Design a protein with these regions (language model features):
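A short SAM/SAH-binding and catalytic strip from SAM-dependent methyltransferases
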Residues: 101-114
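Short alpha-helix
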Residues: 161-177
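Conserved small/polar residues in nucleotide/adenosyl-binding loops
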Residues: 199-201
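A short acidic, Gly/Pro-enriched loop at the edge of an enzyme's catalytic core
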Residues: 91-103
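Conserved alpha-helix/loop element of class I SAM-dependent methyltransferases that forms part
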Residues: 16-36, 46-50
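A short glycine-rich, Lys/Arg-flanked "PGG" loop and its adjoining helix->strand segment in the class I
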Residues: 116-128
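Class I SAM-dependent methyltransferase SAM/SAH-binding core
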Residues: 38-40, 44-92
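Conserved beta-strand signature within the Rossmann-like core of class I S-adenosyl-L-methionine
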Residues: 129-137
Length: 201
């Protein structure tokens, strides 16, 4: 792992993932979590301030990047909830089935190499009747914008930690045999080429 991945990328991701419009999407979703939470892509802990300690008993965060995790130290210290980290990607999570009440995924499916396998892992670990909460960015509905997503993604992925701006998030859920109760779609302020924002609560 080079200097960029160790020192520059974690700072850039922490800053980018905490900008106002993205933070507002997190604030809409995360407070709905309850019980034992499995958070995929916990990263620098951007979601931690939005968990309700009266509703959440424990957070199990999954993230393979030790360097971005170090940037969560202050947010972890300020959080009243017990936090455990598993330093792996989301495709193979060493947890028993049916132990989580809620799965939270925010701006992480874009980076997981095998996102469908990761979604199946989430459902394995989720208790019957549990819920998956997510906000993501993905494939733009406008074909002209989606063409640009396809053009920039090879380079964008290299500089943004594997992020794929044009992923078809609803299609990934369909491939994992998951259905939405509700799905809100919108462009948030910023370059549209970075994708449509999707929210499921």
């Amino acid at each position: 792992m080079g200097f960029y991945a160790k020192h520059i990328l974690p700072r850039c991701l922490d800053a980018a993932c905490g900008i106002g419009p993205i933070s507002k999407q997190r604030e809409k979703v995360v407070p709905h979590a309850e019980g034992v939470v499995l958070e995929i892509g916990i990263g620098s802990g951007q979601n931690l301030p939005f968990y309700n300690p009266d509703k959440v008993s424990k957070i199990i965060g999954v993230d393979p990047d030790e360097h971005i995790w170090k940037r969560s130290a202050k947010r972890r210290a300020d959080c009243e909830i017990e936090i455990e980290r598993i330093g792996l990607s989301g495709e193979d999570i060493p947890l028993d089935k049916n132990i989580a009440d809620t799965v939270v995924v925010t701006y992480s499916l874009c980076t997981i190499p095998d996102a469908v396998k990761a979604l199946r892992e989430m459902t394995r670990i989720l208790k019957p009747g549990g819920k998956i909460l997510f906000t993501e960015h993905g494939k733009a509905p406008d074909e002209a914008i989606h063409k640009w997503q396809r053009r920039i993604d090879p380079l964008w992925g290299k500089i943004a930690g594997g992020c794929r701006s044009g992923r078809d998030i609803p299609e990934l859920f369909r491939q994992a045999d998951l259905k939405f109760d509700t799905l809100e779609e919108m462009y948030i302020p910023g370059p549209k080429v970075l994708g449509l924002s999707l929210i499921h609560i």
